[in-house]
């Protein structure tokens, strides 16, 4: 068994933005400002697939895609002759991840359990995270020949494991 708790959301992501109905990758300049760049071909391919399933993303829509999920999951899969990979993380299905109201993406930074939307403050002192597109992760696993047993959000997983009963079972601990 391979268990990864809150690993996927910490993997590097590519930011993108739709400007004048064109997709741009967002980079960072020396002034710590986001600047539009020509998109990575793999990024563009994934976005086109998302738009073919969900419809066009609105103009000025910004989000992120984790291109390293596939090589990372491939690496994990290569360790298994048999067994399972259990990934626990924060995220959404593709439909919810790229919903029109989530037009600024999910990229956040955390410091002392507080969330911030600007990752350029206290660089090196904050954890940077982006939620996981569970649909994309599941698709990668199936493409690798893994059997998908199911997926749910971390909140639903913990609720199903009766996390709320821990305090009652072990008061004061």
Question: What is the meaning of each model-derived region?
Answer:
Residues 48-173:
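Long, Lys/Arg- and hydrophobic-enriched amphipathic alpha-helices
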